[in-house]
From Swiss-Prot:
Keyword Chloroplast part of the UniProt annotation: yes
Primary gene name: rpl31
Family per record: Belongs to the bacterial ribosomal protein bL31 family. Type A subfamily.
Residue ranges that the Swiss-Prot or TrEMBL entry lists as coiled coil: none
A biological process from GO: translation
Organism listed in the record: Gracilaria tenuistipitata var. liui (Red alga)
Keyword terms of this UniProt record: Chloroplast, Plastid, Ribonucleoprotein, Ribosomal protein, RNA-binding, rRNA-binding
Protein name listed in UniProt: Large ribosomal subunit protein bL31c
Protein role: Binds the 23S rRNA.
Length: 79
């Protein structure tokens, strides 16, 4: 016996948005998907390098290990 009503609703034409622009259509359990990165702007696929630090992880690492970034060193030299 199979159980009824246990599977999520499936949308064949889910629109995927990146930076407010429609970038592709896929199948999903949600009607719309909003993403920060997709294959059209990911550094691996575009060949460009971009630092993605949305939550301050670089600063947290620098503080944790008492390291200074180049900007901090330059500002201290100017003083």
């Amino acid at each position: 016996m199979t159980q009824k009503s246990i599977h999520p609703k499936w949308f064949n034409d889910t629109k995927v948005y990146c930076d407010g622009k429609h970038v592709m259509t896929v199948g999903s359990t949600q009607a719309e998907l909003h993403v920060d990165i997709w294959s059209g702007n990911h550094p691996f696929f575009t060949g460009s390098q971009r630092i993605i630090d949305t939550e301050g992880r670089v600063e947290k690492f620098m503080r944790k290990y008492n390291l200074q970034s180049n900007n901090d060193k330059q500002s201290k030299l100017e003083v």
